[in-house]
């Protein structure tokens, strides 16, 4: 918790729970998954959480298929406002291509909730895609191509995002 008694200007509790599961499907084919839930709640004299403390989702290490921090509530100009609750889920199939070159196919999902949390499949943003990882001595370097899936409608192939990554997303 952040507390005025501990030197903070704000009083709030913020918690994040994240679960990672990995399994070998067949020989060198790995299934990797992640679930993340976050919550921030004010108390005491703090009534609203300032934007710089809120949760944001979207982007290469979050929900691919969307721009950085572009999931969730936005102001009238389309700028992200963040929220008090966060949900993200990822599943990725990792497979060898040749030597240090690996391939991935994935589906990501998530949402940011302004003031109340209600998990509903139609409220979530989804992204699907594929990518490659080159394994170096300091970790993988990757490139992903992802498409947003809006309200579970068919994929629009003209709307896509490329991501360059260093390290595993999860």
Spans of model-derived segments:
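C-terminal outer-membrane beta-barrel translocator/porin domains of Gram-negative envelope proteins
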Residues: 1-97, 105-109, 113-115
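Short, solvent-exposed loop/turn segments at secondary-structure boundaries
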Residues: 8-11, 117-120, 154-156
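One face of beta-strands
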Residues: 17-19, 33, 126-130, 141
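Residue-level signature of outer-membrane beta-barrel architecture
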Residues: 21-23, 93-95, 134-136, 145-147, ...
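Repeated loop/turn-to-beta-strand initiation elements of outer-membrane beta-barrel proteins
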Residues: 26-31, 99-103, 134-143
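Outer-membrane beta-barrel translocator/channel fold
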Residues: 39-52, 141, 147-161
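Strand-loop-strand
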Residues: 115, 120-136
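Outer-membrane beta-barrel "beta-signal"
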Residues: 132-137, 159-170
